[in-house]
Amino acid sequence: MNNIALSTEASVSSWIRRHGHWVLTLYVAFVFIQSLFFKFTGSPETVYIFEGKLDPWAASLGFAGVFAPGGIFSAKVVGTFELIASLLLLVGAAMAHRRTVQVIGAAMGLGVISGAIFFHLFTPLGVAVVNADGSSDGGELFMLACGVWISCALLLWMRRGIWLRWLSMLTHRGA
């Protein structure tokens, strides 16, 4: 009976090592790609978040227009980065000899989603986004963002050999 438990643990561990990166990649890509429709079409929810909440907040700090259309952090710019990160993650997951691409996608995804989490926590946007019509998402966007952050961090941990090798090459270049 003990051997069966050990065998099951070993097979689960083996499955996670072989396929876990796919689960994480598909989750991140799903969250990022499904949000593109909202970001690229100027949906009322997206307009409210970027132009109704974040841009006035940034303007109060002297950075007017950064979240408005054409701004450096506009919905379309953020969506473009999410699309690129998703594509890099998917290509890197599908092609074993291109795992470095997955690392770049995970790092890019982690950076983008860290910004989203920051703006949920430290701006008037809030954890539970209350739309202009008074409806609330109940924290769904924030929870999805946290899931993406964890997934990207786990992917970077799973592929740590790649970026640690890069770091080693960079730090020993001048030695």
Question: Which functions belong to the PLM regions below?
Answer:
Residues N2-A175:
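Membrane-interface extramembranous regions
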